[in-house]
Amino acid sequence: MSLPQTYKRAVFKELGHPLTVEDAPLKLPGPNELLIKVEACGVCYSDMYSQYNGLGGGFPIVPGHEIIGKVAVVGSEVRDWNVGQRIGAGWHGGHDGTCKACKQGYFQMCDSTAVNGATKEGGYAEYTLIRSESAVHIPANVDAASYAPILCAGLTVFNSIRNVNIRAGETVAVQGLGGLGHLAIQYAKRMGYRVVAISRGPEKEAAARELGADEYIDSNEGDSGEQLAALGGAALAVTTASTGEAITPLLKGLGILGKLLVLSFPSNLTLEPTDLLKYGLSVHFWPSGHPSDAEDAVRFAENTNIASVVEKFPLEQAQQAFESMLSGKVRFRAVITMD
């Protein structure tokens, strides 16, 4: 694979500034790194942390952690990858292998974790470097743009749902019909659950049912928790809402020993302990996953025909893609492509 001297990248140069597309000298990988020729990179809400230095990566920084491409160069000490192989990378950008989390196999919880697109350069670029321990095997036949969101949004919902141990056949409610929510509905349905979608407005019901929801709750029509309880309640409520005010009512819709799974960074989340204690309810968070988890999520999606619904943007329109994601103009997921 021939390599250029320079490559294009979309970069945050200063705190709070918009993305700038520029040419930069191409760097070759270190001993334990891989150079990826990027095909597609999803645009995630958490990319905003890169814009505001939320994880201390500094500037300039290339965001993006839903990366799919092909191996362009293999580092001298990397043994299990070859040039031309399909490869991906998600939020998890590397780990130390020595902390308690790593010793238990929870590499994404590493005390010294690296984050693609936040503490190191990410995938809003024609090429990017990743650490070999963060690399994800991607099937050669899948569409890069459709599968890129699986590496964060899909992985997060898949890995969190399977780790809260809800029995097949139970009811799972999914609050929010965006990038995470539209994949959560599909994963939950394919896992064998009765799925109740919760969103605002009657116009979203058709899309929710097309994705696999068995029931739809319009939260504009009344308390979402009370409506969920009227449908029999849920063993699990998955929420992607950004405010605590939207999340708290869901507790009313949980059954005995029900679980609330929070997959967002909500502001002002206040929980009333009385109902939690009375009914044995619990609140859970889950930090995405590591490469093996991502490969499970991709394999499950491929085997069960789960599909990300995406809107594509060329790299030159990276700022437009980012703004469209933040404003909600993109219904499900924006993806930057290098075509």
Curated annotation (Swiss-Prot):
<keyword id="KW-0521">NADP</keyword>
<dbReference type="InterPro" id="IPR013149">
    <property type="entry name" value="ADH-like_C"/>
</dbReference>
<comment type="similarity">
    <text>Belongs to the zinc-containing alcohol dehydrogenase family.</text>
</comment>
<dbReference type="InterPro" id="IPR002328">
    <property type="entry name" value="ADH_Zn_CS"/>
</dbReference>
<feature type="binding site">
    <location>
        <begin position="295"/>
        <end position="297"/>
    </location>
    <ligand>
        <name>NAD(+)</name>
    </ligand>
</feature>
<feature type="binding site">
    <location>
        <begin position="263"/>
        <end position="265"/>
    </location>
    <ligand>
        <name>NAD(+)</name>
    </ligand>
</feature>
<feature type="binding site">
    <location>
        <position position="204"/>
    </location>
    <ligand>
        <name>NAD(+)</name>
    </ligand>
</feature>
<feature type="binding site">
    <location>
        <position position="44"/>
    </location>
    <ligand>
        <name>Zn(2+) 1</name>
    </ligand>
</feature>
<comment type="function">
    <text>Alcohol dehydrogenase; part of the gene cluster that mediates the biosynthesis of notoamide, a fungal indole alkaloid that belongs to a family of natural products containing a characteristic bicyclo[2.2.2]diazaoctane core. The first step of notoamide biosynthesis involves coupling of L-proline and L-tryptophan by the bimodular NRPS notE, to produce cyclo-L-tryptophan-L-proline called brevianamide F.</text>
</comment>
<dbReference type="GO" id="GO:0008270">
    <property type="term" value="F:zinc ion binding"/>
</dbReference>
<feature type="binding site">
    <location>
        <begin position="287"/>
        <end position="289"/>
    </location>
    <ligand>
        <name>NAD(+)</name>
    </ligand>
</feature>
<keyword id="KW-0560">Oxidoreductase</keyword>
<feature type="binding site">
    <location>
        <begin position="196"/>
        <end position="201"/>
    </location>
    <ligand>
        <name>NAD(+)</name>
    </ligand>
</feature>
<keyword id="KW-0520">NAD</keyword>
<feature type="binding site">
    <location>
        <position position="66"/>
    </location>
    <ligand>
        <name>Zn(2+) 1</name>
    </ligand>
</feature>
<dbReference type="Pfam" id="PF08240">
    <property type="entry name" value="ADH_N"/>
</dbReference>
<keyword id="KW-0862">Zinc</keyword>
<feature type="binding site">
    <location>
        <begin position="176"/>
        <end position="181"/>
    </location>
    <ligand>
        <name>NAD(+)</name>
    </ligand>
</feature>
<feature type="binding site">
    <location>
        <position position="102"/>
    </location>
    <ligand>
        <name>Zn(2+) 2</name>
    </ligand>
</feature>
<feature type="binding site">
    <location>
        <position position="110"/>
    </location>
    <ligand>
        <name>Zn(2+) 2</name>
    </ligand>
</feature>
<protein>
    <recommendedName>
        <fullName>Alcohol dehydrogenase notN</fullName>
        <ecNumber>1.1.1.1</ecNumber>
    </recommendedName>
</protein>
<dbReference type="InterPro" id="IPR020843">
    <property type="entry name" value="PKS_ER"/>
</dbReference>
<dbReference type="InterPro" id="IPR013154">
    <property type="entry name" value="ADH-like_N"/>
</dbReference>
<keyword id="KW-0479">Metal-binding</keyword>
<feature type="binding site">
    <location>
        <position position="152"/>
    </location>
    <ligand>
        <name>Zn(2+) 1</name>
    </ligand>
</feature>
<dbReference type="GO" id="GO:0005737">
    <property type="term" value="C:cytoplasm"/>
</dbReference>
<feature type="binding site">
    <location>
        <position position="65"/>
    </location>
    <ligand>
        <name>Zn(2+) 1</name>
    </ligand>
</feature>
<dbReference type="InterPro" id="IPR036291">
    <property type="entry name" value="NAD(P)-bd_dom_sf"/>
</dbReference>
<feature type="binding site">
    <location>
        <position position="65"/>
    </location>
    <ligand>
        <name>an alcohol</name>
    </ligand>
</feature>
<dbReference type="Pfam" id="PF00107">
    <property type="entry name" value="ADH_zinc_N"/>
</dbReference>
<dbReference type="GO" id="GO:0004022">
    <property type="term" value="F:alcohol dehydrogenase (NAD+) activity"/>
</dbReference>
<dbReference type="InterPro" id="IPR011032">
    <property type="entry name" value="GroES-like_sf"/>
</dbReference>
<feature type="binding site">
    <location>
        <position position="99"/>
    </location>
    <ligand>
        <name>Zn(2+) 2</name>
    </ligand>
</feature>
